[in-house]
Amino acid sequence: MYTLVRKTLVALFAVILFAGLCGHAQARNIYSDTADAHKDIQQALELAKREHKRVILDFGGNWCGDCQVLDIYFHQQPNLDLLNKYFVLVHINVGRFDKNTDLAEKYQVPLKKGVPALAVLSASGKLLYSQKNGEFEAMRRMDAASVTQFLNEWKPAKV
């Protein structure tokens, strides 16, 4: 009897622990449903100009697993330091490919190739890079080093 109760308690504890871990694995709310992306970009450009940085536009959606992976890679070192030192990051919610499509068009980001999709702007707003071939839409098959390489390639030259 004691063994049965013990096994039951261990199994119950494992189920509770597993349920708790699953709750933490939920997608983060990276892309705001209420943000004004036009305003966010303008504010990012103003900050980039003051701090001599570039702006990264990250087009995606909270439903997108690859977008979640990109965000994880953005928060790993050395990527987090590179972002903080050289870039202002703007997350732009594309909804189900029905939001902010005007911005994707303006910055020449073909959302039909998939998300996440990135664009890099100078502090003056000049388009320096736009993702053309869905390079980051398969983030789950890439690693953090590919993000590091991208950030190093597009960080501003030393002044």
Where are the predicted features?
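N-terminal secretory signal peptides that target proteins for export/translocation
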Residues: 1-6
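Bacterial N-terminal signal peptides
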Residues: 11-20
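N-terminal "domain-start" segment that seeds a small globular fold
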Residues: 25-44
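Short active-site neighborhood of thiol/selenol oxidoreductases, capturing the structured segment around
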Residues: 51-62
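Typically the conserved alpha-helix immediately C-terminal to a functionally engaged Cys/Sec
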Residues: 67-82
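Thiol-based oxidoreductase modules, predominantly thioredoxin-like and allied folds used
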Residues: 79-101
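Structural alpha/beta surface segment adjacent to cysteine/selenocysteine redox centers
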Residues: 98-115
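Non-catalytic, surface beta->alpha helical segment in thiol-disulfide oxidoreductase systems
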Residues: 113-158
